[in-house]
């Protein structure tokens, strides 16, 4: 277990320190079927929609698939921009994990595109990456969690 309190770790750790290299991007004109195929092939729950200058113009996530795409009358030939979310919140790689967690909680999102000083996409931070980081930081605590949050055992062995 780390010597510093978790609050300090989250404030001191910068996003670039835990960032994974995977970044899925597409143009707004990408056909809906192509976007869904990309998400399936890459086993990811998001695509950053960026213009030809790599600036974020939207996000297309599993949530958009569930809320907008799984409706009658949707054409798989429509451009993904018709279904993407346009109120996208971004951060930079130098922002803290605490800032990312705060933004995810405040806006109800699980993926945050990262932009550089030119406002171009340079990465993505997902809640999964944050959880993996915390699990690696606190392995004993994570591995000893009960299967259900409300489950309490009298002994360490679970009996």
Predicted regions mapped to residue ranges:
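Tandem CBS (Cystathionine beta-synthase) repeat/Bateman regulatory domains
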Residues: 1-159
């Amino acid at each position: 277990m780390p010597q510093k309190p978790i609050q300090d770790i989250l404030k001191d750790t910068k996003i670039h320190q835990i960032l994974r290299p995977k970044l899925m991007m597409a143009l707004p004109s990408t056909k809906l079927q192509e976007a869904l195929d990309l998400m399936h092939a890459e086993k990811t729950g998001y695509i950053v929609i960026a213009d030809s200058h790599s600036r974020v113009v939207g996000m297309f996530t599993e949530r958009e698939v569930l809320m907008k795409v799984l409706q009658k009358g949707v054409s798989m030939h429509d451009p993904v921009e018709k279904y993407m979310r346009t109120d996208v919140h971004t951060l930079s790689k130098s922002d803290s994990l605490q800032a990312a967690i705060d933004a995810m909680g405040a806006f109800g999102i699980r993926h945050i595109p990262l932009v550089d000083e030119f406002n171009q996409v340079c990465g993505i931070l997902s809640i999964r990456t944050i959880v993996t980081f915390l699990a690696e930081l606190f392995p004993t605590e994570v591995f000893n969690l009960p299967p259900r949050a409300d489950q309490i055992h009298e002994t360490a062995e679970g009996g």
